[in-house]
């Protein structure tokens, strides 16, 4: 490379080098600014997190752990990882944290690698009751490599059937019991799960990927000291970059998890992401994060109450956390049709199966809604009640139209109201 081309490589902007990608990013920024984000697993990160994630830390390979790397030149990325570890430990009140998992699936796989052998039995919440793919779905590695015993919710009230958990644990003697899910809107009884795990000699693993921000903010009971290990993603209610964390109080387990992450599952960690995790943990340690977590729950409850008043069923009758499942059958709608219609009205959500759902997984009878992203924008109860009424308006219009194409007039009217709302709560002004 000539001096001129080298200078160009280091200094040309994305807009100059790749206008197609630059354009796609610009359009996505517009979508995020003007639409209401209700996907429960999504959030909006701070400028500080974005800057760390987009930093030159991405250039550095750092196989191993701080102070024990297989590459030279790691003295500064060590600072970032050590900060991430210490802040995660402080945030959740634990003795050990591994901040290297690249995703939620990989953090859970690392725990399996550390605690299970192929063919061993573990228990997890059934996907149809609000569990996760990695909790034993037959299409996932967890369901292919291990003997999975699933538990679920009761058909009457859609609450966890703890008697079923105890009965199946006694019958199948699992090595691991997973508590936690992706679409359960009530408080988890960690103490009862630990009692059941102890009764059969199982490890209790808590996947708190969805509720970790609420745990950190004091709005949901901590799984510690009840669990042996907890895993969480960092990009949902924690409001950080995409990635995972493994937490424990037990040194012998911490060593197993470290070995499982590296070299068991991953090679070089993503140091720019770890730096961004450290920033997000630092933000979550501030007093205002507790206010944020409390507002999430208030907003979710306001939304659920509004939807119920509008003639919709909310699974289990409401929510204690950041999310809810909405049963659409009273509106003669499916999750697939509702997701599309709401999307056309600039309200983003995801179709989701409800417990004992008669519809196919790609159709579903429900949608899942969450409050974290809207709360980050500054929405409070009044805005979420307005959003709830807009959702009812779209679904009522869909019912009248009785067409997959929706009700264009209603959706256009709601779309205008959504833009008026989001314009009052701007984001990333510095991006122009």
Swiss-Prot record:
Keyword DNA damage (UniProt): no
Amino-acid positions noted as binding (6S)-5,6,7,8-tetrahydrofolate in the UniProt annotation, renumbered to this chain: 127, 131-133
Keyword Cytoplasm set for record: yes
GO cellular component: cytosol
Record-listed E.C. numbers: 2.1.2.1
Cofactors demanded by this protein: pyridoxal 5'-phosphate
Location(s) in or outside the cell: Cytoplasm
Pathway as given in its UniProt record: One-carbon metabolism; tetrahydrofolate interconversion; Amino-acid biosynthesis; glycine biosynthesis; glycine from L-serine: step 1/1
Enzyme class: transferase
Physiological role: Catalyzes the reversible interconversion of serine and glycine with tetrahydrofolate (THF) serving as the one-carbon carrier. This reaction serves as the major source of one-carbon groups required for the biosynthesis of purines, thymidylate, methionine, and other important biomolecules. Also exhibits THF-independent aldolase activity toward beta-hydroxyamino acids, producing glycine and aldehydes, via a retro-aldol mechanism.
Protein name: Serine hydroxymethyltransferase
Biological source species: Rhizobium etli (strain ATCC 51251 / DSM 11541 / JCM 21823 / NBRC 15573 / CFN 42)
């Amino acid at each position: 490379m000539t001096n001129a081309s080298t200078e160009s490589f280091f200094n040309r902007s994305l807009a100059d080098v790749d206008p197609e990608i630059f354009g796609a990013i610009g359009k996505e920024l517009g979508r995020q600014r003007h639409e209401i984000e209700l996907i429960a697993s999504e959030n909006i990160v701070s400028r500080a997190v974005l800057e760390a994630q987009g930093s030159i830390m991405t250039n550095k390979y750092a196989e191993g752990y701080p102070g024990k790397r297989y590459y030279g030149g790691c003295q500064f990325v060590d600072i970032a990882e050590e900060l991430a570890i210490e802040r995660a430990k402080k945030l959740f009140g634990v003795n050990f944290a591994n901040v290297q998992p690249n995703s939620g699936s990989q953090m859970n796989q690392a725990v399996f690698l550390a605690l299970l052998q192929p063919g061993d039995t573990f228990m997890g919440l059934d996907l149809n009751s609000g569990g996760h793919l990695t909790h034993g779905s037959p299409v996932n590695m967890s369901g292919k490599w291990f003997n999975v015993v699933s538990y679920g919710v009761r058909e009457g009230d859609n609450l966890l059937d703890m008697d079923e958990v105890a009965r199946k644990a006694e019958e199948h003697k699992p090595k691991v019991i997973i508590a936690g899910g992706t679409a359960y809107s009530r408080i988890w009884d960690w103490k009862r799960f630990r009692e059941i795990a102890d009764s059969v000699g199982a490890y209790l693993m808590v996947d708190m990927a969805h509720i970790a921000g609420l745990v950190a903010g004091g709005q949901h009971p901590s799984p510690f000291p009840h669990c042996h290990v907890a895993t969480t993603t960092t990009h949902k209610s924690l409001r950080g970059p995409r990635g995972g964390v493994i937490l424990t109080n037990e040194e012998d387990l911490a060593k197993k998890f470290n070995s499982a992450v590296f070299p068991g599952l991953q090679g070089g960690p993503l140091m720019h992401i770890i730096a961004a995790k450290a920033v997000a943990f630092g933000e979550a340690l501030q007093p205002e994060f507790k206010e944020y977590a409390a507002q999430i729950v208030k907003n979710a409850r306001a939304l659920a109450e509004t939807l119920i008043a509008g003639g919709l069923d909310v699974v289990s009758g409401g929510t204690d956390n950041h999310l809810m499942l909405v049963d659409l059958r009273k509106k003669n709608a499916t999750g697939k049709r509702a997701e599309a219609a709401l999307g056309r009205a600039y309200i983003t959500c995801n179709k989701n199966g409800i417990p004992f759902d008669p519809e196919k997984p790609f159709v579903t009878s429900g949608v899942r809604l969450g409050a974290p992203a809207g709360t980050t924008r500054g929405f409070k109860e009044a805005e979420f009640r307005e959003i709830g009424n807009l959702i009812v308006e779209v679904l009522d219009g869909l019912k009248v139209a009785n067409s997959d194409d929706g009700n264009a007039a209603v959706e256009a009217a709601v779309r205008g109201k959504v833009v008026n709302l989001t314009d009052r709560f701007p984001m990333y002004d510095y991006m122009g």
